[in-house]
From Swiss-Prot:
Transmembrane segments: none annotated. It comes from the Bacteria. This is Homoserine kinase. InterPro entries: GHMP_kinase_C_dom, GHMP_kinase_C_sf, GHMP_kinase_N_dom, GHMP_knse_ATP-bd_CS, Homoserine_kinase, Ribosomal_Su5_D2-typ_SF, Ribsml_uS5_D2-typ_fold_subgr. It comes from Mycolicibacterium paratuberculosis (strain ATCC BAA-968 / K-10) (Mycobacterium paratuberculosis). Its main location: cytoplasm. Pfam families: GHMP_kinases_C, GHMP_kinases_N. Keywords: Amino-acid biosynthesis, ATP-binding, Cytoplasm, Kinase, Nucleotide-binding, Threonine biosynthesis, Transferase. The gene is thrB. Belongs to the GHMP kinase family. Homoserine kinase subfamily. Catalyzes the ATP-dependent phosphorylation of L-homoserine to L-homoserine phosphate.
């Protein structure tokens, strides 16, 4: 592929949602976008790289070429066959980092989408949603958060390993309108790579059967039968194994479920996601969270990633 140079002075922006993966049994496959957003603005320049970050993670992320958004922007440009001599990348983050809310997927999807906004000004064909999912999942290693960030709402995703390279794909689900979403976000952090090593390399047929049945039921519960959410969010493959690494979240999870709230770890934790048809959580649940350092927030399903040439103002 012949690579052409983008002119200096192009500006593009993207708005991308947080996401919760797994939702109990849907390990590495089911995801749900949430109404927390990161905003990204990218400008082409004659040379150099400037990265500016405000909000979540501002004092923790690298401000150079290794920044995830920078890597994703460059990946998106490369995929289309263009490059930029220099970039200014500005990130305004509301998605907490290392809490199981898809901050890395949002950074990658947002960076790729911002690249779309640049290439659209150079008479190039922007990346399709399928390409956004493929490229962002290659960064992540699994498509659940990435696909939720691309499509918005609830999704089911899968990996096809039949070819030379894994192919990642997803299909959107129509989330039932009676489902209310809550996130419980602790101060403590957890890295997916650190908790993934707690999972066994092999599982029993009994446990596999259990999770397959619950994952199938979860699709039904999310779309048609929210009264089945408690049973549909049961899991034996990853949450019990991760619990010792995050005792406060594990205890809060048990409390929520004792009060008939369909709660799970959000991704690898330590945040929790709760799905309920009730208009509010039980008072005991609210009080426990506040007393134990959790920020409890009602959410709605997040939108799919949005990109545009120029700067998008979020209302």
């Amino acid at each position: 592929m012949v690579t052409s140079m983008l002119p200096a002075g192009l500006v593009a922006s993207a708005v991308v949602s947080a996401s919760s993966a797994n939702l109990g049994p849907g390990f590495d496959s089911i995801g749900l976008a949430l109404s927390l957003i990161d905003e990204i603005t990218v400008e082409t320049t004659d040379s150099g790289l400037v990265v500016q970050v405000e909000g979540e993670g501002a004092d923790q992320v690298p401000l150079g070429p290794e920044h995830l958004v920078v890597r994703a922007v460059e990946c998106g440009l490369r995929a289309v066959g263009v490059r930029a001599a220099g970039l200014v990348v500005r990130c305004r983050n509301a998605i907490p980092h290392s809490r199981g809310l898809g901050s890395s997927a949002a950074a990658v999807v947002g960076g790729l989408a911002a690249a779309n906004g640049l290439v659209a000004q150079a008479n190039c064909q922007p990346l399709s949603d399928a390409a956004l999912i493929q490229l962002s999942s290659e960064f992540e290693g699994h498509p659940d958060n990435a696909a939720a960030a691309v499509f918005g709402g609830a999704i089911v995703s899968w990996i096809d390993r039949g070819g030379q390279h894994p192919r990642y794909a997803a299909a959107p689900l129509r989330l039932h309108p009676d489902i209310h979403l809550y996130c419980a976000i602790p101060q403590e952090r957890s890295l997916t790579a650190e908790t993934r090593v707690l999972l066994p390399a092999q599982v029993s047929h009994e446990d596999a059967r259990f999770n397959v049945s619950r994952a199938a039921l979860l699709v039904v519960a999310l779309t048609e039968r929210p009264d089945l959410l408690m049973a549909a969010t049961e899991d034996v493959l990853h949450q019990p194994q991760r619990a010792p690494a995050m005792p406060a979240s594990a205890e809060y999870l048990r409390l929520l479920r004792r009060h008939n709230v369909a709660a799970t770890l959000s991704g690898a934790g330590p945040s929790l996601i709760a799905l309920t048809t009730a208009s509010a959580l039980p008072p005991e649940v609210m009080e426990y969270g506040a007393a134990n350092g959790f920020t409890l927030a009602e959410m709605t399903a997040g939108e799919g990633v949005r990109w545009s040439p120029g700067v998008t103002v979020v209302g």
